[in-house]
């Protein structure tokens, strides 16, 4: 293990993708949890707000459950150049 490898951060997109995959896999085992989309929306807003100033009303999370797979759709209106 090198010192330089320890100090490097993982790419944010990859970390977020891994978290969503884990969350969706877990969610598939918890059928009937209607509040999952609301919980996801609040957590996603919190993560984005750390880096960019956003309007919470302009973030939409849609979770569609199908028989074979579920889809998670996230719409975020990003401001022009405003940082948190």
From Swiss-Prot:
Gene3D superfamilies: Cell division topological specificity factor MinE (3.30.1070.10). This is Cell division topological specificity factor. It comes from the Bacteria. It comes from Granulibacter bethesdensis (strain ATCC BAA-1260 / CGDNIH1). GO terms for biological process: cell division; regulation of division septum assembly. Prevents the cell division inhibition by proteins MinC and MinD at internal division sites while permitting inhibition at polar sites. This ensures cell division at the proper site by restricting the formation of a division septum at the midpoint of the long axis of the cell. Belongs to the MinE family. Keywords: Cell cycle, Cell division.
